[in-house]
């Protein structure tokens, strides 16, 4: 009997490992999302490329420099005027590559900063819409970071450093390239091209190359709006990724695989940039956000253009409370350094997460997402605790939480508030109708934990 049970267990495991996902959206969408992604909650997005050299935008999106330069009407001619003034009318976008030297790039330093931020996964632009790749792509001959510019396999070096830190590595990849002649030739007929030369000769080969070479656990597609998914051959690639690739059991993807796909097909949903619905979603989703106005580095952004740590943590909290992941972007400069103002924000978030990690990592949405905009909840299914995130404490120290139902075993703790000998302080608590009332000790402002207050509630319903 024991041998029969073992046989069936092995059979089931083999069937799971050999799961086949055909090239249809029904098949692709039936694949469960690997659990690691929902557990980690917080990641860092990195936009890095030739656009990091001019580092200019008129109102955001500095990574679109080449497009706005070639299409002056898109930003009122601001980029063109800036370009001609700073570099001259005859200076081409390709000329910037010699200034993309990355001479201060240190993959270990980037990974260390990210680890200290509390982020658990990383998404690096392997190729943005400009077509320049951060690895030695055969399809981007003389337009990649190994053969031109810094002479560095940036994808390879950062992948190694990130994985050595115990973090999950992901790669962003643009499906299309603004000015690639093969794509432009395909696209001449509009939304239903009759040829797919660009897809066959460039896109599919590059996607499979980064998967087989670097084994990322996340593929973040973009440029989806330009064509339907059948042009991009998205289901064919995802069928291979989920069935035959070396990362088939752990990899996760987003939903930007065709103009009809967003919030419908693929893995987690992304919506628009900075998507935060402030309500529970039925499907796993991600909020990709910026600290300032650009994803790529913009040297003209001021300190006042950056969100402060409290604002970013509030975005993280409200995202996680509604079942999402928070992907926060940084844009390194052309020398390969992450700007100090961005590093400061990341370290501040990391400080907060070091105190309140149990309320974020591995958490789930509670039965109520928020009481008001200033009070939000998560729960940890492992320990059964509920966590109340409070953005502003009441002046009188009396905090009324109308949603949790307490009993004589209920306890409340303000995470990070220490009493004598550094021991956590249990707060006086009263069961009220509705909810519970907490009496918060009045201490010096510097003795309260920073940014957003998190209350651990035990034995509540």
Swiss-Prot record:
It is an enzyme of class 3 (hydrolase). One of its GO terms (molecular function) is 1,6-alpha-L-fucosidase activity. Residues 1-18 form the signal peptide. It catalyses: an alpha-L-fucoside + H2O = L-fucose + an alcohol. It comes from the Eukaryota. Its EC number is 3.2.1.51. The record marks 288 as: May be important for catalysis. InterPro entries: FUC_metazoa-typ (IPR016286), Fucosidase_C (IPR031919), Glyco_hydro_29 (IPR000933), Glyco_hydro_29_CS (IPR018526), Glyco_hydro_b (IPR013780), Glycoside_hydrolase_SF (IPR017853). Keywords: Glycosidase, Hydrolase, Signal. Transmembrane segments: none annotated. The keyword Signal applies. GO terms for biological process: fucose metabolic process; glycoside catabolic process; response to cAMP. The maximum expression of alpha-L-fucosidase occurs during aggregation stage of dictyostelium discoideum. Belongs to the glycosyl hydrolase 29 family. Alpha-L-fucosidase is responsible for hydrolyzing the alpha-1,6-linked fucose joined to the reducing-end N-acetylglucosamine of the carbohydrate moieties of glycoproteins. This is Alpha-L-fucosidase.
């Amino acid at each position: 009997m024991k041998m029969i049970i073992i046989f069936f267990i092995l059979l089931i495991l083999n069937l799971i490992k050999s799961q086949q996902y055909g090239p249809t959206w029904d098949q692709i969408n039936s694949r469960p999302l690997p659990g690691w992604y929902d557990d980690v909650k917080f990641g860092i997005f990195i936009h890095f490329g030739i656009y990091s050299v001019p580092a200019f935008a008129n109102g955001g999106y500095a990574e679109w420099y080449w497009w706005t330069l070639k299409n002056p009407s898109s930003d009122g001619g601001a980029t063109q005027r800036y370009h001609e003034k700073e570099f001259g009318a005859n200076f081409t976008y390709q000329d910037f590559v010699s200034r993309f030297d990355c001479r201060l790039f240190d993959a270990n330093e980037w990974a260390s900063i990210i680890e200290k931020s509390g982020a658990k996964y990383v998404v690096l632009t392997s190729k943005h819409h400009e077509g320049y790749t951060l690895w030695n792509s055969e399809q981007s001959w003389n337009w990649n970071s190994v053969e031109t510019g810094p002479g560095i396999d940036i994808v390879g070096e950062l992948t190694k450093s990130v994985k050595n830190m115990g973090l999950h590595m992901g790669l962003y990849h643009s499906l299309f390239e603004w000015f690639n002649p093969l794509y432009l030739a395909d696209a001449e007929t509009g939304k239903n091209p009759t040829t797919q030369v660009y897809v066959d000769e460039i896109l599919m080969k590059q996607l499979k190359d980064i998967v087989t070479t670097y084994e990322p656990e996340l593929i973040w597609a973009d440029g989806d709006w330009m064509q339907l998914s059948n042009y991009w051959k998205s289901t064919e690639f995802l069928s291979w990724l989920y069935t035959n690739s070396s990362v088939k059991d752990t990899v996760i993807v987003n939903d930007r695989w065709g103009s009809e796909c967003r919030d419908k097909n693929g893995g987690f949903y992304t919506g628009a940039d900075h998507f935060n619905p402030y309500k529970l979603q039925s499907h796993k989703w991600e909020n990709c956000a910026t600290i300032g106005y650009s994803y790529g580095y913009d040297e003209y952004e001021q300190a006042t253009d950056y969100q402060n740590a409290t604002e970013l943590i509030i975005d993280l909290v409200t995202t996680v409370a509604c079942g999402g992941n928070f992907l926060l972007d940084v844009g390194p400069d052309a020398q390969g350094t992450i700007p100090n103002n961005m590093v400061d924000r990341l370290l501040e978030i990391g400080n907060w997460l070091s105190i309140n990690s149990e309320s974020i990592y591995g958490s789930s949405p509670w039965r109520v997402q928020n009481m008001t905009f200033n009070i939000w909840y998560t729960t940890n299914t492992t320990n059964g605790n509920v966590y109340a995130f409070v953005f502003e404490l009441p002046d009188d120290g009396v905090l009324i939480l109308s949603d949790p139902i307490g009993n004589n075993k209920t306890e409340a703790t303000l995470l990070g508030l220490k009493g004598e000998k550094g021991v956590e302080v249990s707060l006086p608590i009263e069961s009220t109708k509705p909810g519970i009332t907490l009496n918060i000790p009045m201490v010096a402002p510097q003795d309260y934990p920073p940014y957003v207050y998190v209350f651990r509630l035990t034995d509540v319903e």
